[in-house]
Amino acid sequence: MPLHNLTRFPRLEFIGAPTPLEYLPRFSDYLGREIFIKRDDVTPMAMGGNKLRKLEFLAADALREGADTLITAGAIQSNHVRQTAAVAAKLGLHCVALLENPIGTTAENYLTNGNRLLLDLFNTQIEMCDALTDPNAQLEELATRVEAQGFRPYVIPVGGSNALGALGYVESALEIAQQCEGAVNISSVVVASGSAGTHAGLAVGLEHLMPESELIGVTVSRSVVDQLPKVVNLQQAIAKELELTASAEILLWDDYFAPGYGVPNDEGMEAVKLLARLEGILLDPVYTGKAMAGLIDGISQKRCKDEGPILFIHTGGAPALFAYHPHV
């Protein structure tokens, strides 16, 4: 078992049973290709999402260190911050969130609805900044201030994307491999690639468990030149933690995130509407809509390695739909 070292790391059980891996019959008929979806949008806390897998490891480490406060950062509409705040509430911890407005909007829905509304329900302490130009340093500075107030803070990086958090997606690769075994031979796996932890964790896990499947990361905020080192560095850090090799090539598509992070585009919104109308499944304008736009275009452009079944990793994000009205 190449991933046996995963069990060495403390982990809280937030998710329980594996999330569904489903065939999408109407969407498959529409695209002329077998499409499956991994439903990490239905993880069981705070309207779901992929970050809960990372937080199982990160929150366990926070408790091990005796922390009473979780500190993290992201956009006003960050899914990661929302899920971190929910975990803090569940564990009886304080949560401080450092937020930016990356799209510079004054739209009331963006500033107050969606994920931002949920932060208030979770009693999150909000700190605003002009921009997360150096989030690691900014989080450390915030942690110093919080500690001076008598709290014991634990810093969770943007997206929960460090080697420890990304173990959640090595774990997910195990789930996927078990669900596919004897049922379907997946040719390509498509995932949104942003803070890179989900992508890198899957890269390490799938290399050892499903080596014949290609993993495609569709970038949501950066060009390949900027995103590749983030994914590779995390891939290697995860491999080091697990004492194994990671030599799989990182494949990225950067044609679908323009005009920029957090700004909806026509192709992404069309993908959101398409999956809603054909399968009753909700994507989001920031991550999964753009990743699905990549999948759709990738099929039409024959960018995938062959004509075999494709698995789409649904990382969640539907609460942001309410924040982006009337774009939706």
UniProtKB/Swiss-Prot annotation:
Q: Which reaction does it catalyse?
A: D-cysteine + H2O = hydrogen sulfide + pyruvate + NH4(+) + H(+)
InterPro entries, per database record:
ACCD_DCysDesulf (IPR027278), D-Cys_desShydrase (IPR005966), D_Cys_desulphydr_bac (IPR023702), TrpB-like_PALP (IPR001926), TrpB-like_PALP_sf (IPR036052)
A single Gene Ontology MF term assigned here is:
D-cysteine desulfhydrase activity
Keywords of the record, alphabetical order, are: Lyase, Pyridoxal phosphate
Q: Which cofactor does it need?
A: pyridoxal 5'-phosphate
GO BP field: D-amino acid metabolic process
Q: EC number(s) in its UniProt entry? A: 4.4.1.15
NCBIfam families to which the protein is assigned, alphabetical: ACC_deam_rel, PRK03910.1-1, PRK03910.1-3, PRK03910.1-5
Protein name from the UniProt record: D-cysteine desulfhydrase
